[in-house]
Structures are given as C-alpha cells and as structure tokens.
Amino acid sequence: MNKEFDEDVFYDLRYDVYFKNFFLNNKMLAGFLSLLWNTKVNPEDITYDNTESVLPLGKKIIYDVVANVTLHKKEEINVNLEMQNLYHKYLNERMAFYAMRKYSDKLKRANEFGNICIESIWFLGFNDSKFHDNNTEKWLSEYKLTNEDGNVLTDKFRIDQIFLKNKDKCPIIELQEFFKLCTSLDKHNLPEFSTEYAKEAKEMLLKMNNDKALRAESFSHEMFLRDQKAQFKTAREEGLEEGIAKGLEEGLVKGKAEGKAEGIQE
C-alpha cells in the first residue's frame, strides 16, 4: 500500500498541496506575516493573485502562493511564498528569476511610466533541502539589490530564504513552534504548542489531514513528482552510460591510432 493512502500518515506543510491550501487561508497568512514582519497584518487586507505567469513561446511559471498585502492602508506588498523540498543546482538563479518575473509583470501593468510606482515584490522561500549560503547556521537570509558599499538600489525587490533545518535558531517563539509543522510528523505524537498562532495552525492542519479529497489530491501530486524525478534519474543514468560507452569507443580508436603511429616510426 502506498503510504499516502495510509490513514496514519500525517501530511505536513512540506507537501505542496497542503502548503498552498494552508497559506490560501488569509487568516493563517496574516498571522504568519504579522509575526515575521513584526507588524499587524489584517486578513481582510490580503487578496490573492494569479499563480501563473506566461513566458515567451507559451511556457508558464506556476507559483505556490501569490498574495497582495496592504499594510497600514497605504503600503502595497506582493508576496510570493514557495516551498522548496528538493535540492536544485540553480536554486539561487531560480529564486531570482521567479521574483524578477513577478516584478516585471507588475511593471507591465503600471499606468504611469514616467514615474513608475508599483508595490514591493517580496519572495519568501521555505527551504527544506541543501542550500549554498555563506552562513549555513542562519534560520533566515535576506537578499536585496545593493552596490559594493551596501547601498540598496530599490526597496521594492527582496528575496528571503527560511532554512527549516535551522528552525530552532529562530528567535520568534511563535514561528519556531510553527516551523515544526514543516517537518516529518507522527499523527499519534504531534508536538504540543504554547503559542496561539502555532496552536491555530496545528488545528487547521489537522482538519486538512481529515479532508479525504485533499489527501487524494496531495497523493496524486506527489506521485506525479516522483514519476518526474524517476524520469530525470533514468535520463541521467542513460546519458552517463552513453557517455562512458562513447568515451571508451573513442579511447580505443585513439589508442589504435597511436599504436599504429608508433609502429610505423619504429
């Protein structure tokens, strides 16, 4: 039996379907952002944006969660949340591309090109895989466009990475508890929380895990990802075998040619 169909399996927030559905609840997203930004975010000040961006030649970027947040009735922030479970060789470039693409989309919609004023673009990645960073002990890294003196070019473009493996280093107790929901969990031994937000998040995740339709959707999505990963692995192995065979063949040809040349010289 596939473990995803086992009723004892608890889907945590690393699973794409559960991550998306959790943060598509404006109360849960508002609570999370309020803690992370240390400022009040109201659920009613959050609207959700299109998660697709069409590229040239008809290709698309599919984002996990995209929301527009209004702070203090004046500041507009476009938030893109992504869960990254698998190591990606070009993860840095991928994050930058996602964020810049969303920034570009907003620029295209701007009405006054003489004095462009768009909301800030903020990309937040939850990273549960290996990630190259100068300080791997951080729980959070912040990236901005700066010059060699550290002067910020624009405050409307930012990329942050949360390193889940270092969640215990987070000084915000509410988030430190919440991040435990982004790790492998035992349904019969779920962590107990002392903070209000983590308790509410746990309760919602329990309800989501009792949703049979959501479990089926998550299972289908995970099977697709596994099949895709298996195809990539097979392609790499076949490419490696082909490369080795070709290398051996070329080596034999070269060896014969060199041996023949040496024989003629002698």
Language-model regions: role of each:
Residues 1-266:
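Elongated, amphipathic alpha-helical interaction scaffolds
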